[in-house]
Amino acid sequence: MAIAGICLIGFGIGTFYPNYISKINIEEKAADKTILWAKEIGFAEPRITVGSDEEFIKTMQKCIAYLNLELHKGERIPDDLIIAQAIIESNAGLSRFAREGNNLFGIRVWNKDAGMLPHGYTDTLSWRVKSYNTKCASVRDYIKILNTKQAYAEFRKIRDKQNKWYGK
């Protein structure tokens, strides 16, 4: 009788609270299929355009939505945070680094042979401002930095806690 009760409890728990790892694997496979499907029908990286603030924000939102297809739900960064940072760092895409190097966040590279040198600095500077092929590529790199660098570990803890609270 005790064994039957334990089995019933285990079944109930498994039914209403599925295995976390299995759930993640299923979500990852579904996301991979969605990405493949989107690319098959011609869904491509959107172009971030600069003109008015509204245009910049709308095209940033499209880029973020596109990049979110590649990310697991728990790795996504709030749109408002990304857009606000891009507006502050690049003057809504109008800065020299945004115009010439597609860098919306002032991301640096520690390679003297790559990137852009800020005006007024000499070649002795040990870093450069990283250049990208597209503005959306700089958004991808910014998301990667927030998701991987030790400096943003506390941010990730807070995001994970909020995702848990809101069921994301």
Give the role of each language-model region:
Residues 89:
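Pyridoxal 5′-phosphate
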Residues 1-83, 92-168:
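Catalytic cores of secreted/periplasmic lytic hydrolases that degrade extracellular macromolecules
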